[in-house]
Amino acid sequence: MAKGKFERTKPHVNVGTIGHVDHGKTTLTAAIATVLSKKFGGEAKGYDQIDNAPEEKARGITINTSHVEYETTTRHYAHVDCPGHADYVKNMITGAAQMDGAILVCSAADGPMPQTREHILLARQVGVPYIIVFLNKCDMVDDAELLELVEMEVRELLSKYEFPGDDLPIIKGSAKLALEGDQGPLGEAAILALADALDSYIPTPERAVDGAFLLPVEDVFSISGRGTVVTGRIERGIVKVGESLEIVGIRDTQVTTCTGVEMFRKLLDQGQAGDNVGVLLRGTKREDVERGQVLAKPGSIKPHKHFTGEIYVLSKDEGGRHTPFFNNYRPQFYFRTTDVTGSIELPKDKEMVMPGDNVSITVMLINPIAMEEGLRFAIREGGRTVGAGVVAKIIE
Protein backbone atom coordinates (compact mmCIF):
# COMPACT_ATOMS: atom_id res chain seq x y z
CA MET A 1 0.00 0.00 0.00
CA ALA A 2 1.38 3.42 -0.91
CA LYS A 3 2.20 5.66 2.02
CA GLY A 4 -0.44 8.38 2.20
CA LYS A 5 0.68 11.96 1.80
CA PHE A 6 1.33 13.60 5.17
CA GLU A 7 -1.31 16.30 5.44
CA ARG A 8 -0.25 19.10 7.75
CA THR A 9 -3.73 20.39 8.32
CA LYS A 10 -3.77 19.77 12.08
CA PRO A 11 -1.20 20.65 14.73
CA HIS A 12 1.17 17.80 15.48
CA VAL A 13 1.83 16.51 19.02
CA ASN A 14 4.26 13.81 20.19
CA VAL A 15 3.15 11.52 23.00
CA GLY A 16 4.09 8.13 24.42
CA THR A 17 3.07 5.49 26.92
CA ILE A 18 5.13 4.97 30.08
CA GLY A 19 4.63 2.76 33.15
CA HIS A 20 5.42 -0.60 34.75
CA VAL A 21 5.92 -3.79 32.74
CA ASP A 22 2.66 -5.66 32.01
CA HIS A 23 0.40 -2.85 33.16
CA GLY A 24 -0.95 -2.59 29.60
CA LYS A 25 1.04 0.10 27.76
CA THR A 26 1.09 -1.72 24.42
CA THR A 27 -2.53 -2.87 24.69
CA LEU A 28 -3.55 0.72 25.39
CA THR A 29 -1.50 1.95 22.42
CA ALA A 30 -3.32 -0.55 20.17
CA ALA A 31 -6.68 0.42 21.70
CA ILE A 32 -6.15 4.15 21.08
CA ALA A 33 -5.12 3.57 17.45
CA THR A 34 -8.06 1.21 16.88
CA VAL A 35 -10.81 3.24 18.56
CA LEU A 36 -9.70 6.58 17.09
CA SER A 37 -9.27 5.18 13.58
CA LYS A 38 -12.91 4.05 13.74
CA LYS A 39 -14.06 7.49 14.76
CA PHE A 40 -11.69 9.85 12.92
CA GLY A 41 -10.16 7.72 10.18
CA GLY A 42 -6.54 6.61 10.00
CA GLU A 43 -4.95 3.22 10.31
CA ALA A 44 -5.68 0.78 13.13
CA LYS A 45 -2.70 -1.20 14.37
CA GLY A 46 -2.98 -4.52 16.16
CA TYR A 47 -1.19 -5.44 19.38
CA ASP A 48 1.24 -7.73 17.51
CA GLN A 49 2.25 -5.00 15.06
CA ILE A 50 3.08 -2.70 17.95
CA ASP A 51 4.68 -5.30 20.20
CA ASN A 52 7.36 -6.40 17.76
CA ALA A 53 9.04 -3.03 17.74
CA PRO A 54 11.73 -2.39 15.14
CA GLU A 55 15.26 -1.58 16.26
CA GLU A 56 16.47 1.97 15.81
CA LYS A 57 19.75 3.66 16.44
CA ALA A 58 19.96 6.95 18.31
CA ARG A 59 23.44 8.29 19.07
CA GLY A 60 24.83 4.82 18.41
CA ILE A 61 22.48 3.20 20.91
CA THR A 62 20.09 0.48 19.79
CA ILE A 63 16.54 1.11 20.95
CA ASN A 64 13.37 -0.81 20.20
CA THR A 65 10.46 1.56 19.65
CA SER A 66 7.04 1.32 18.04
CA HIS A 67 5.55 4.37 16.38
CA VAL A 68 1.80 4.71 15.97
CA GLU A 69 -0.12 7.65 14.51
CA TYR A 70 -3.68 8.68 15.25
CA GLU A 71 -5.96 11.68 14.93
CA THR A 72 -8.57 13.47 16.98
CA THR A 73 -10.89 16.23 15.75
CA THR A 74 -8.27 18.88 16.37
CA ARG A 75 -4.87 17.18 16.28
CA HIS A 76 -2.53 14.66 14.76
CA TYR A 77 -0.59 12.52 17.27
CA ALA A 78 2.61 10.53 16.91
CA HIS A 79 2.77 7.99 19.73
CA VAL A 80 5.77 5.94 20.87
CA ASP A 81 5.63 2.71 22.80
CA CYS A 82 8.62 0.61 23.91
CA PRO A 83 8.62 -3.12 24.60
CA GLY A 84 11.16 -3.20 27.43
CA HIS A 85 12.09 -1.08 30.43
CA ALA A 86 15.65 -0.55 29.15
CA ASP A 87 14.22 0.82 25.88
CA TYR A 88 12.26 3.44 27.83
CA VAL A 89 15.34 4.50 29.76
CA LYS A 90 17.38 4.88 26.56
CA ASN A 91 14.55 6.53 24.65
CA MET A 92 13.83 9.15 27.25
CA ILE A 93 17.47 9.96 27.98
CA THR A 94 18.63 10.20 24.35
CA GLY A 95 15.51 12.11 23.39
CA ALA A 96 15.14 9.76 20.42
CA ALA A 97 11.43 10.14 20.96
CA GLN A 98 10.73 13.62 22.29
CA MET A 99 7.45 13.67 24.18
CA ASP A 100 5.22 16.73 24.50
CA GLY A 101 3.28 14.69 27.03
CA ALA A 102 3.18 11.13 28.35
CA ILE A 103 0.39 8.71 29.16
CA LEU A 104 1.26 6.93 32.40
CA VAL A 105 -0.38 3.50 32.35
CA CYS A 106 -0.98 2.00 35.78
CA SER A 107 -2.85 -1.21 36.52
CA ALA A 108 -5.72 -0.62 38.91
CA ALA A 109 -5.29 -4.21 40.10
CA ASP A 110 -1.66 -3.71 41.16
CA GLY A 111 -1.25 -0.01 41.85
CA PRO A 112 2.06 1.83 41.36
CA MET A 113 5.08 -0.48 41.01
CA PRO A 114 8.88 0.16 40.91
CA GLN A 115 8.95 1.06 37.20
CA THR A 116 5.93 3.33 37.62
CA ARG A 117 8.06 5.37 39.99
CA GLU A 118 11.16 5.11 37.84
CA HIS A 119 9.36 6.28 34.69
CA ILE A 120 7.86 9.25 36.56
CA LEU A 121 11.33 10.16 37.84
CA LEU A 122 12.76 9.83 34.32
CA ALA A 123 9.96 11.98 32.92
CA ARG A 124 10.82 14.65 35.50
CA GLN A 125 14.57 14.41 34.84
CA VAL A 126 14.33 14.58 31.05
CA GLY A 127 11.69 17.30 31.08
CA VAL A 128 8.50 15.60 29.86
CA PRO A 129 6.17 18.54 30.57
CA TYR A 130 2.77 16.85 31.01
CA ILE A 131 1.51 13.49 32.27
CA ILE A 132 -1.98 12.04 31.90
CA VAL A 133 -2.81 8.84 33.79
CA PHE A 134 -4.70 5.88 32.35
CA LEU A 135 -5.78 3.62 35.20
CA ASN A 136 -5.98 0.33 33.32
CA LYS A 137 -7.61 -3.05 34.08
CA CYS A 138 -10.42 -1.35 36.02
CA ASP A 139 -12.66 -4.24 34.92
CA MET A 140 -10.66 -6.45 37.30
CA VAL A 141 -11.39 -4.31 40.37
CA ASP A 142 -14.89 -4.56 41.83
CA ASP A 143 -14.21 -2.45 44.89
CA ALA A 144 -14.72 1.27 44.26
CA GLU A 145 -12.78 2.15 47.41
CA LEU A 146 -9.77 0.21 46.18
CA LEU A 147 -9.88 2.15 42.89
CA GLU A 148 -9.95 5.39 44.83
CA LEU A 149 -6.98 4.25 46.89
CA VAL A 150 -4.92 3.42 43.80
CA GLU A 151 -5.81 6.77 42.24
CA MET A 152 -4.70 8.53 45.42
CA GLU A 153 -1.40 6.62 45.45
CA VAL A 154 -0.68 7.54 41.83
CA ARG A 155 -1.49 11.21 42.47
CA GLU A 156 0.80 11.27 45.52
CA LEU A 157 3.62 9.66 43.58
CA LEU A 158 3.30 12.22 40.77
CA SER A 159 3.25 15.12 43.26
CA LYS A 160 6.39 13.74 44.90
CA TYR A 161 8.21 14.20 41.59
CA GLU A 162 6.86 17.73 41.10
CA PHE A 163 4.04 16.94 38.68
CA PRO A 164 0.65 18.49 39.59
CA GLY A 165 -0.65 15.20 41.02
CA ASP A 166 -3.88 16.67 42.38
CA ASP A 167 -4.90 18.36 39.15
CA LEU A 168 -3.84 16.14 36.27
CA PRO A 169 -6.43 14.00 34.49
CA ILE A 170 -6.84 10.34 35.46
CA ILE A 171 -8.93 8.21 33.11
CA LYS A 172 -10.29 4.88 34.37
CA GLY A 173 -10.77 2.11 31.85
CA SER A 174 -9.74 -1.20 30.36
CA ALA A 175 -7.55 -1.18 27.26
CA LYS A 176 -8.43 -4.83 26.64
CA LEU A 177 -12.18 -4.15 26.67
CA ALA A 178 -11.71 -1.13 24.41
CA LEU A 179 -9.66 -3.19 21.96
CA GLU A 180 -12.48 -5.75 21.87
CA GLY A 181 -14.96 -2.99 20.99
CA ASP A 182 -16.73 -2.90 24.36
CA GLN A 183 -19.33 -0.11 24.46
CA GLY A 184 -19.41 0.26 28.26
CA PRO A 185 -17.81 3.11 30.21
CA LEU A 186 -14.52 1.23 30.67
CA GLY A 187 -14.23 0.31 26.98
CA GLU A 188 -14.28 2.59 23.94
CA ALA A 189 -15.73 5.44 26.01
CA ALA A 190 -12.62 5.47 28.22
CA ILE A 191 -10.37 5.73 25.16
CA LEU A 192 -12.40 8.66 23.81
CA ALA A 193 -12.16 10.31 27.25
CA LEU A 194 -8.38 9.79 27.11
CA ALA A 195 -8.28 11.39 23.64
CA ASP A 196 -10.20 14.39 25.00
CA ALA A 197 -7.73 14.66 27.88
CA LEU A 198 -4.81 14.61 25.43
CA ASP A 199 -6.46 17.37 23.39
CA SER A 200 -7.29 19.60 26.32
CA TYR A 201 -4.51 18.97 28.85
CA ILE A 202 -1.40 18.94 26.65
CA PRO A 203 -0.88 22.37 25.08
CA THR A 204 0.09 22.57 21.42
CA PRO A 205 3.90 22.58 21.47
CA GLU A 206 5.77 25.64 20.26
CA ARG A 207 7.05 25.03 16.75
CA ALA A 208 10.81 25.15 16.36
CA VAL A 209 10.59 28.26 14.18
CA ASP A 210 8.78 30.16 16.96
CA GLY A 211 11.62 29.66 19.46
CA ALA A 212 14.50 32.05 20.22
CA PHE A 213 17.09 31.84 17.42
CA LEU A 214 19.85 29.28 18.02
CA LEU A 215 22.45 27.89 15.63
CA PRO A 216 25.17 25.47 16.80
CA VAL A 217 28.41 26.45 15.04
CA GLU A 218 29.77 23.66 12.83
CA ASP A 219 32.37 25.52 10.80
CA VAL A 220 33.93 28.97 10.47
CA PHE A 221 35.36 30.54 7.30
CA SER A 222 36.92 33.85 6.47
CA ILE A 223 35.85 35.36 3.14
CA SER A 224 38.16 38.13 2.04
CA GLY A 225 36.44 41.47 1.73
CA ARG A 226 33.25 40.16 3.31
CA GLY A 227 34.12 38.94 6.78
CA THR A 228 33.55 35.79 8.78
CA VAL A 229 30.98 33.14 7.87
CA VAL A 230 29.65 30.64 10.39
CA THR A 231 27.87 27.54 9.08
CA GLY A 232 25.45 25.16 10.74
CA ARG A 233 21.84 24.03 10.93
CA ILE A 234 19.43 26.40 12.64
CA GLU A 235 18.04 24.54 15.64
CA ARG A 236 15.19 26.94 16.35
CA GLY A 237 13.89 30.40 15.58
CA ILE A 238 14.61 32.76 12.70
CA VAL A 239 17.61 34.97 11.92
CA LYS A 240 17.20 38.12 9.82
CA VAL A 241 19.86 40.22 8.16
CA GLY A 242 20.74 43.21 10.36
CA GLU A 243 19.94 41.54 13.68
CA SER A 244 22.46 41.49 16.49
CA LEU A 245 23.43 38.06 17.81
CA GLU A 246 25.48 36.60 20.64
CA ILE A 247 28.26 34.04 20.29
CA VAL A 248 27.88 31.86 23.39
CA GLY A 249 29.96 29.10 24.97
CA ILE A 250 33.58 28.03 25.56
CA ARG A 251 34.80 31.63 26.02
CA ASP A 252 33.28 34.96 27.04
CA THR A 253 30.02 35.82 25.27
CA GLN A 254 30.51 38.24 22.36
CA VAL A 255 28.00 40.39 20.50
CA THR A 256 28.01 40.47 16.70
CA THR A 257 25.72 41.43 13.81
CA CYS A 258 24.32 39.23 11.05
CA THR A 259 25.04 40.93 7.72
CA GLY A 260 23.97 38.09 5.47
CA VAL A 261 22.36 34.63 5.34
CA GLU A 262 23.30 32.17 2.61
CA MET A 263 21.75 28.86 1.68
CA PHE A 264 22.77 26.73 -1.31
CA ARG A 265 24.98 29.64 -2.41
CA LYS A 266 21.96 31.93 -2.60
CA LEU A 267 21.55 35.05 -0.48
CA LEU A 268 18.46 35.14 1.72
CA ASP A 269 17.04 37.86 3.92
CA GLN A 270 16.40 35.33 6.67
CA GLY A 271 17.04 31.73 7.71
CA GLN A 272 14.74 29.60 9.85
CA ALA A 273 14.71 26.43 11.97
CA GLY A 274 15.82 23.41 9.96
CA ASP A 275 17.81 25.40 7.36
CA ASN A 276 21.48 24.64 6.77
CA VAL A 277 22.93 28.11 6.40
CA GLY A 278 26.01 30.26 6.36
CA VAL A 279 25.65 33.37 8.51
CA LEU A 280 27.89 36.32 7.71
CA LEU A 281 29.04 38.20 10.81
CA ARG A 282 30.22 41.78 10.94
CA GLY A 283 33.17 42.77 13.10
CA THR A 284 33.94 39.22 14.13
CA LYS A 285 37.33 37.70 13.33
CA ARG A 286 37.76 34.15 12.12
CA GLU A 287 39.65 33.30 15.34
CA ASP A 288 36.87 34.70 17.57
CA VAL A 289 34.46 31.87 16.77
CA GLU A 290 34.86 28.10 16.95
CA ARG A 291 32.91 24.91 16.50
CA GLY A 292 30.99 24.08 19.67
CA GLN A 293 29.80 27.62 20.30
CA VAL A 294 26.30 28.76 19.36
CA LEU A 295 24.93 31.84 17.62
CA ALA A 296 21.86 32.94 19.54
CA LYS A 297 19.33 35.68 20.05
CA PRO A 298 20.87 38.02 22.67
CA GLY A 299 20.00 37.05 26.24
CA SER A 300 18.24 33.83 25.25
CA ILE A 301 20.87 31.33 26.42
CA LYS A 302 23.76 31.42 28.89
CA PRO A 303 27.00 29.46 29.18
CA HIS A 304 27.24 26.98 32.10
CA LYS A 305 29.63 24.32 33.26
CA HIS A 306 28.11 22.87 36.44
CA PHE A 307 24.92 20.80 36.16
CA THR A 308 23.11 17.64 37.17
CA GLY A 309 22.11 15.14 34.54
CA GLU A 310 20.52 11.79 33.99
CA ILE A 311 22.69 9.39 31.98
CA TYR A 312 22.47 5.97 30.40
CA VAL A 313 25.78 4.11 30.18
CA LEU A 314 26.13 1.87 27.14
CA SER A 315 26.51 -1.84 27.77
CA LYS A 316 29.51 -3.77 26.47
CA ASP A 317 27.31 -5.25 23.71
CA GLU A 318 26.38 -1.75 22.55
CA GLY A 319 30.05 -0.91 22.10
CA GLY A 320 30.33 0.77 25.49
CA ARG A 321 32.81 0.28 28.31
CA HIS A 322 33.64 -3.21 29.55
CA THR A 323 34.33 -2.00 33.10
CA PRO A 324 32.52 0.21 35.61
CA PHE A 325 33.52 3.80 36.30
CA PHE A 326 33.88 5.52 39.66
CA ASN A 327 33.55 8.95 41.24
CA ASN A 328 35.58 11.69 39.49
CA TYR A 329 35.58 9.80 36.17
CA ARG A 330 36.66 12.33 33.47
CA PRO A 331 35.25 11.60 30.01
CA GLN A 332 34.36 14.04 27.22
CA PHE A 333 30.84 15.44 27.02
CA TYR A 334 29.69 15.97 23.44
CA PHE A 335 27.23 18.90 23.30
CA ARG A 336 25.74 19.70 19.86
CA THR A 337 28.95 19.93 17.83
CA THR A 338 31.91 19.53 20.19
CA ASP A 339 33.53 17.62 23.06
CA VAL A 340 34.28 19.24 26.43
CA THR A 341 36.06 17.37 29.22
CA GLY A 342 34.26 17.17 32.53
CA SER A 343 34.36 15.26 35.79
CA ILE A 344 31.48 13.18 37.11
CA GLU A 345 30.33 13.17 40.72
CA LEU A 346 28.19 10.15 41.62
CA PRO A 347 25.33 10.16 44.15
CA LYS A 348 26.49 9.46 47.73
CA ASP A 349 25.00 5.95 47.75
CA LYS A 350 26.58 4.92 44.45
CA GLU A 351 30.14 3.62 44.56
CA MET A 352 30.38 2.82 40.86
CA VAL A 353 28.36 2.72 37.65
CA MET A 354 28.20 -0.44 35.56
CA PRO A 355 27.81 -0.57 31.77
CA GLY A 356 24.04 -0.76 31.06
CA ASP A 357 23.08 1.35 34.13
CA ASN A 358 21.25 4.64 34.28
CA VAL A 359 22.14 7.10 37.02
CA SER A 360 21.79 10.72 38.15
CA ILE A 361 25.13 12.55 38.17
CA THR A 362 26.63 15.98 38.80
CA VAL A 363 29.07 17.26 36.17
CA MET A 364 31.71 19.99 36.21
CA LEU A 365 32.97 20.90 32.72
CA ILE A 366 36.36 22.54 32.13
CA ASN A 367 34.77 25.06 29.71
CA PRO A 368 31.25 26.53 29.76
CA ILE A 369 28.75 25.47 27.08
CA ALA A 370 25.54 27.23 25.96
CA MET A 371 23.15 25.13 27.98
CA GLU A 372 19.52 24.73 29.02
CA GLU A 373 17.66 22.12 30.98
CA GLY A 374 16.65 19.33 28.61
CA LEU A 375 19.76 19.61 26.42
CA ARG A 376 21.00 16.19 25.28
CA PHE A 377 24.65 15.13 25.24
CA ALA A 378 26.80 12.08 24.53
CA ILE A 379 29.57 10.85 26.81
CA ARG A 380 32.68 9.85 24.90
CA GLU A 381 36.12 8.42 25.47
CA GLY A 382 38.57 9.11 22.70
CA GLY A 383 35.82 9.66 20.13
CA ARG A 384 33.88 6.52 21.09
CA THR A 385 30.41 6.96 22.59
CA VAL A 386 30.12 5.30 26.00
CA GLY A 387 26.93 6.95 27.23
CA ALA A 388 24.08 9.36 26.60
CA GLY A 389 22.58 11.95 28.88
CA VAL A 390 20.33 14.92 29.38
CA VAL A 391 20.79 18.08 31.47
CA ALA A 392 18.32 17.87 34.37
CA LYS A 393 19.21 21.01 36.36
CA ILE A 394 21.77 23.76 35.91
CA ILE A 395 23.72 24.52 39.08
CA GLU A 396 25.71 27.53 37.86
Swiss-Prot record:
The keyword Oxidoreductase does not apply. Residues 19-26 are annotated as: G1. It is found in: Cytoplasm. Residues 136-139 are annotated as: G4. GO terms for molecular function: GTP binding; GTPase activity; guanosine tetraphosphate binding; translation elongation factor activity. Mg(2+) binds at residue 26. Transmembrane segments: none annotated. Residues 60-64 are annotated as: G2. GO terms for cellular component: cytosol. It comes from the Bacteria. Its EC number is 3.6.5.3. GTP binds at residues 19-26, 81-85, 136-139. The keyword Protein biosynthesis applies. It is an enzyme of class 3 (hydrolase). Pfam families: GTP_EFTU (PF00009), GTP_EFTU_D2 (PF03144), GTP_EFTU_D3 (PF03143). Residues 174-176 are annotated as: G5. Residues 81-84 are annotated as: G3. It catalyses: GTP + H2O = GDP + phosphate + H(+). InterPro entries: EF-Tu_GTP-bd (IPR041709), EF-Tu_GTPase (IPR050055), EFTu-like_2 (IPR004161), EFTU_2 (IPR033720), G_TR_CS (IPR031157), P-loop_NTPase (IPR027417), Small_GTP-bd (IPR005225), T_Tr_GTP-bd_dom (IPR000795). Keywords: Cytoplasm, Elongation factor, GTP-binding, Hydrolase, Magnesium, Metal-binding, Nucleotide-binding, Protein biosynthesis. Belongs to the TRAFAC class translation factor GTPase superfamily. Classic translation factor GTPase family. EF-Tu/EF-1A subfamily. NCBIfam families: EF-Tu (TIGR00485), PRK00049.1 (NF000766), PRK12735.1 (NF009372), PRK12736.1 (NF009373), small_GTP (TIGR00231). Monomer. GTP hydrolase that promotes the GTP-dependent binding of aminoacyl-tRNA to the A-site of ribosomes during protein biosynthesis. This is Elongation factor Tu. It comes from Herminiimonas arsenicoxydans.
